[in-house]
């Protein structure tokens, strides 16, 4: 990895990616590195390793492409956030993005709007498949898959089985009931807001589109 430290008396820069399809490149100014209790630094280093996956695997992996031919890839930011909080787990529930997670948790896990907030699904997948699973997911993704499509292929599950897993994930996250999260999540169990709900047929409720 190439690390470039820039001295800008009044500048703020933190950028992690790569260069020439060969190697990860981290660019920082001294004022940016320690921001957010060093989370910014760890996040951008995560991006460098993400770029390196693309370099090492011939542009077919690592989501340097836009999944499904769309625009953007929220999983890049989600995973960089998650990687940072594996270094600083005490901050995973105490940061500027956690409230955004609570407000948007009902949305699809790859939704673009809360791309910096959805950094918990990775913990669930590692809980089920081991800590090295995220590395496998990044290295073995195939253009034009998104992260969910790659996950389902690698784990060999159906749509119905994936939906069952998402229910299990949501049920566990109600009390942060997985080993990686239970210690620091214990104080946040009662933090979830209740989104606006609409009663529909057969005594079911669904989240209002206004949410």
Residues covered by each model-derived region:
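Extracellular structured ligand-interaction cores
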Residues: 2, 45, 77, 117-119
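Soluble non-cytosolic domains of exported or imported proteins
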Residues: 31-36, 40, 70, 74, ...
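Substrate-binding/catalytic groove segments of enzymes
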Residues: 56-59, 90-95, 128-136
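Post-HExxH zinc-binding segment in Zn-dependent metallohydrolases
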Residues: 64-112, 124
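Extracytoplasmic, non-cytosolic globular domains
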Residues: 79, 83, 117-163
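Beta/coil-rich, acidic/histidine-enriched accessory regions frequently appended to metallopeptidases
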Residues: 144-211
């Amino acid at each position: 990895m190439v690390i470039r430290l820039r001295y800008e008396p009044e500048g703020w820069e933190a950028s992690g990616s790569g260069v020439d399809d060969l190697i990860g490149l981290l660019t920082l100014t001294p004022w940016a590195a320690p921001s957010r209790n060093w989370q910014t630094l760890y996040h951008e280093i995560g991006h460098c390793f993400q770029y390196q996956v693309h370099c090492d695997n011939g542009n077919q992996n690592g989501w340097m492409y836009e999944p499904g031919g769309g625009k953007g890839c929220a999983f890049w930011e989600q995973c960089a956030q998650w990687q940072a909080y594996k270094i600083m787990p005490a901050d995973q529930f105490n940061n500027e993005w956690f409230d955004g997670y609570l407000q948007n948790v009902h949305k699809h896990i790859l939704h673009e709007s809360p791309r910096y907030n959805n950094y918990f699904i990775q913990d669930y997948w590692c809980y089920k498949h081991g800590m090295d699973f995220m590395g496998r997911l990044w290295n073995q993704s195939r253009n034009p898959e998104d992260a969910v499509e790659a996950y389902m292929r690698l784990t060999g599950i159906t749509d119905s089985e994936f939906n069952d897993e998402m229910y299990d994930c949501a049920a566990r996250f109600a009390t942060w009931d997985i080993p990686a999260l239970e210690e620091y999540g214990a104080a946040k169990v009662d933090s979830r807001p209740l989104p606006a709900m609409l009663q529909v047929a057969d005594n079911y409720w669904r989240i209002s589109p206004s949410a």
